[in-house]
Amino acid sequence: MSRSCELTGKGVQSGNNVSHANNKTKRKFLPNLCNVTLISDALGQRFRLRVSAAALRSVEHRGGLDAFLLKADENELSMRARLLRRQIVKKAAEAA
């Protein structure tokens, strides 16, 4: 399991700890990942995803998992999220 968000692609970054004496040592900045269960209204199913806290706020802001995935860029999504997005688009096309 990689340390990256399945919805936004946010991952590990590297940088430096900088002391008061300006000594620099390498460090990693890890994303704040949470294992969450999100519900798809279109598919009527629950999906367990590993997302960052920022992505979780974005999902809430856009009005749920379906709306977030429809607006999201496919390049940022994980393979599981891309498959889920395609299923939602297909279901929406059938309903229309």
Curated annotation (Swiss-Prot):
Keyword Ribosomal protein in annotation: yes
Pfam families, A to Z: Ribosomal_L28
Region annotated Disordered, chain positions: 1-24
Stored InterPro entries: Ribosomal_bL28, Ribosomal_bL28/bL31-like_sf, Ribosomal_bL28_bact-type, Ribosomal_bL28_sf
Cellular component, GO annotation: cytosolic large ribosomal subunit
Biased composition (Polar residues): 1-22
Similarity comment: Belongs to the bacterial ribosomal protein bL28 family.
Xref: HAMAP family: Ribosomal_bL28
Protein name (Swiss-Prot/TrEMBL): Large ribosomal subunit protein bL28
